[in-house]
Amino acid sequence: MPGTSELITVAVPKGRLLQESSALFERALGVSPRKLLEGTRKLAADAPEAGLRFISIRAGDVASYVEHGAAEVGIVGLDVLREEPRDLYEPLDLGIGRCTVIVARPKGARPLPRGVAPRVATKYLSLAARHFAAKGVPAEIIPLHGSIEVAPSLGLADTIVDITETGETLRANGLVIEEKVLEVSARLVVNRVALKLHPERLRRLIEALRAAVAEAGAEAR
């Protein structure tokens, strides 16, 4: 059994992904980060029987923790990875946290006059800019971090780029999806230095999770 200093640190995001990823870890290794972390004020919990330490942090920060070596492994949405590319090894699509980054406009909105740059409200500054640039559209990107769906109704933007799971919030705000930008799911990411320092232990972790993902997928079919 590894000592405390030898545990592999896994950064798991708070919220829905913590619950979904916990099911995979429980299936793969018999440990649940959600169960270990719940009922405590601490943001870290050890599972020495699996050789792991789990830390619970904000979803948008997981990639930074792993890239800079504060955690060896993490779970990150593909939207985060494509918005701000990182020097990380991405060995596995976990098949959880499925959503779509989309372009949406008010239902029944008239097309903008030719030559008029659309005002696009979004938290995905890079993804949105690349998407419209690829279409040859000189969009004005308006950075927002919340309540993006109301921007068109308040006259702040003509269009939004946002992430959605069911589209219900979009419909409730009178918006319709025009395009899909990126299909999103959570990915397992690994620090590249850690991969050289602990190749066998990380390989076993990756393969155990890979088998759990395949098993969960087979059951869902």
Curated annotation (Swiss-Prot):
<dbReference type="InterPro" id="IPR001348">
    <property type="entry name" value="ATP_PRibTrfase_HisG"/>
</dbReference>
<keyword id="KW-0547">Nucleotide-binding</keyword>
<dbReference type="GO" id="GO:0005737">
    <property type="term" value="C:cytoplasm"/>
</dbReference>
<keyword id="KW-0067">ATP-binding</keyword>
<dbReference type="InterPro" id="IPR024893">
    <property type="entry name" value="ATP_PRibTrfase_HisG_short"/>
</dbReference>
<comment type="pathway">
    <text>Amino-acid biosynthesis; L-histidine biosynthesis; L-histidine from 5-phospho-alpha-D-ribose 1-diphosphate: step 1/9.</text>
</comment>
<dbReference type="Pfam" id="PF01634">
    <property type="entry name" value="HisG"/>
</dbReference>
<comment type="subunit">
    <text>Heteromultimer composed of HisG and HisZ subunits.</text>
</comment>
<dbReference type="GO" id="GO:0005524">
    <property type="term" value="F:ATP binding"/>
</dbReference>
<dbReference type="GO" id="GO:0000105">
    <property type="term" value="P:L-histidine biosynthetic process"/>
</dbReference>
<protein>
    <recommendedName>
        <fullName>ATP phosphoribosyltransferase</fullName>
        <ecNumber>2.4.2.17</ecNumber>
    </recommendedName>
</protein>
<keyword id="KW-0328">Glycosyltransferase</keyword>
<comment type="function">
    <text>Catalyzes the condensation of ATP and 5-phosphoribose 1-diphosphate to form N'-(5'-phosphoribosyl)-ATP (PR-ATP). Has a crucial role in the pathway because the rate of histidine biosynthesis seems to be controlled primarily by regulation of HisG enzymatic activity.</text>
</comment>
<keyword id="KW-0963">Cytoplasm</keyword>
<keyword id="KW-0808">Transferase</keyword>
<keyword id="KW-0028">Amino-acid biosynthesis</keyword>
<dbReference type="InterPro" id="IPR013820">
    <property type="entry name" value="ATP_PRibTrfase_cat"/>
</dbReference>
<keyword id="KW-0368">Histidine biosynthesis</keyword>
<dbReference type="GO" id="GO:0003879">
    <property type="term" value="F:ATP phosphoribosyltransferase activity"/>
</dbReference>
<comment type="similarity">
    <text>Belongs to the ATP phosphoribosyltransferase family. Short subfamily.</text>
</comment>
<dbReference type="InterPro" id="IPR018198">
    <property type="entry name" value="ATP_PRibTrfase_CS"/>
</dbReference>
